């Protein structure tokens, strides 16, 4: 995943 996507997923988790 892209850094931005990973950041969004990290926020959800």
Swiss-Prot record:
Transmembrane segments: none
Entry GO terms, CC: extracellular region
Cellular localization per UniProt: Secreted
Distribution of this protein across tissues and organs: Expressed by the venom gland.
GO biological process entries: chemotaxis
GO-annotated molecular function: toxin activity
Keywords: Amidation, Chemotaxis, G-protein coupled receptor impairing toxin, Mast cell degranulation, Secreted, Toxin
Leucine amide PTM sites in chain numbering: 13
Function (record text): Mast cell degranulating peptide. Induces the chemotaxis of neutrophils. Its mast cell degranulation activity may be related to the activation of G-protein coupled receptors in mast cells as well as interaction with other proteins located in cell endosomal membranes in the mast cells.
Family: Belongs to the MCD family. Crabrolin subfamily.
UniProt protein name: Vespid chemotactic peptide A
Source organism of this protein record: Vespa analis
Classification lineage: Eukaryota, Metazoa, Ecdysozoa, Arthropoda, Hexapoda
């Amino acid at each position: 995943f892209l850094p931005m996507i990973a950041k969004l997923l990290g926020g959800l988790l």
